[in-house]
């Protein structure tokens, strides 16, 4: 795969030298071969999903930091050096967001994540000029496309939720970490160029289903009760704004139609996502209780944090 080859070539140029690369091959066809002694390959017989693959890579190493990087992303030579320097300077921060830029346009893909009142998450700064985020600052949590995690934090709160399979695992992990009292930094200049949705497609039935289902998983597990009660109403509002954005030729639903799919398919995917969440409700409630028991900040503090890094559902629908 050309994207993966470019990704690995970029890692070979890193100014930070004390690292190893673990590539998890989810193709089921042993398509990835190690390029050097620094690269280790874990080959799965089938696609086990993003969360499981990430956890395999994390368990395969004992390093104090874990850097996540999508196979369709290319890191600037100073990427790791800047992330590790930021981590060394902030021991209470357990995760760090990169300055992720969109391939081609040079605009931002993400400078951390934002969350809506229904549990939807979107990339902070998506489509904006990098100059808008030229200074390092705090973030809610990083996008898993290019992030640094402190192993001590992962040992404490757990790894990625493997039941998500695809999408939103980074938000779920980030919210669990914030509830446990860990901070998150955004590191300006720790630059990665990302071919957005190169691997799974920008707007497909697969993506629509998993994003909606995992939004529900994330909300049920993590949102404060008062927000969880109102989340369905905000979700309905988001569905309405999706229709409006589609008619205006904007947003993911418009992309879905341009890709050749019928918008009439989306309600069925939404229903399927809700049925899946209902089936898994006992486990989600159990996880919610576990997260609450391990919380180190109050519900009020957590709500204030979510409000600080919020995005309204109309904006979610338009992006």
Whereabouts are the PLM-identified features?
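Active-site-adjacent helix/loop segment of glycosyltransferases
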Residues: 180-286, 300-307
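Acidic helix N-cap motif at the loop->helix transition within catalytic regions
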Residues: 29-38
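Short aromatic/hydrophobic "clamp" motif used to bind/position activated sugar donors
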Residues: 66
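A short, conserved alpha-helix in the catalytic core of glycosyltransferases
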Residues: 140-191
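Glycine-rich, basic loop-to-helix element that forms the pyrophosphate-binding segment
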Residues: 43-61, 71
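A recurrent flexible, glycine/aromatic-enriched loop bordering the glycosyltransferase active site
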Residues: 107-109, 120, 128-152, 171, ...
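Short, acidic, metal-binding catalytic loop of nucleotide-sugar glycosyltransferases
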Residues: 9-18
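Conserved donor NDP-sugar-binding/catalytic core segment of glycosyltransferases
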Residues: 74-115
């Amino acid at each position: 795969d050309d994207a993966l080859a470019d990704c690995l070539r970029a890692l070979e140029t890193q100014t930070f030298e004390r690292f190893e690369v673990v590539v998890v091959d989810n193709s089921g066809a042993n398509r990835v071969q190690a390029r050097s002694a620094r690269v280790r390959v874990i080959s799965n017989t089938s696609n086990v999903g993003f969360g499981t693959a990430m956890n395999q890579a994390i368990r395969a190493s004992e390093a104090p930091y874990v850097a996540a990087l999508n196979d369709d992303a290319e890191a600037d030579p100073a990427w790791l050096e800047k992330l590790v320097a930021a981590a060394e300077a902030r021991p209470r921060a357990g995760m760090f967001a990169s300055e992720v830029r969109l391939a081609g346009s040079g605009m931002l893909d993400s400078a951390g994540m934002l969350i809506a009142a229904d549990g939807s998450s979107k990339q902070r700064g998506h489509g904006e000029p990098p100059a808008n985020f030229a200074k390092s600052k705090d973030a809610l949590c990083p996008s898993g496309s290019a992030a640094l995690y402190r192993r001590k934090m992962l040992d404490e709160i757990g790894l990625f939720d493997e039941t998500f399979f695809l999408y939103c695992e980074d938000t779920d992990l980030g919210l669990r970490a914030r509830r446990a009292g860990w901070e998150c930094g955004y590191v300006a200049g720790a630059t990665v160029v990302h071919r957005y949705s190169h691997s799974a497609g920008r707007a497909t039935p697969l993506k629509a289903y998993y994003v909606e289902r995992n939004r529900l998983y994330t909300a049920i597990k993590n949102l404060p009760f008062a927000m969880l009660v109102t989340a369905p109403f905000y979700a309905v509002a988001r569905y309405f704004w999706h229709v409006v954005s589609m008619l205006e030729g904007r947003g993911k639903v418009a992309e879905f139609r341009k890709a050749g799919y019928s918008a009439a398919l989306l309600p069925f995917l939404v229903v399927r996502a809700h049925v899946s969440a209902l089936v898994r409700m006992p486990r989600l409630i159990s996880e919610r209780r576990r997260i609450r028991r391990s919380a180190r900040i109050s519900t009020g503090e957590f709500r204030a944090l979510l409000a600080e890094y919020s995005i309204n559902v109309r904006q979610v629908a338009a992006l």
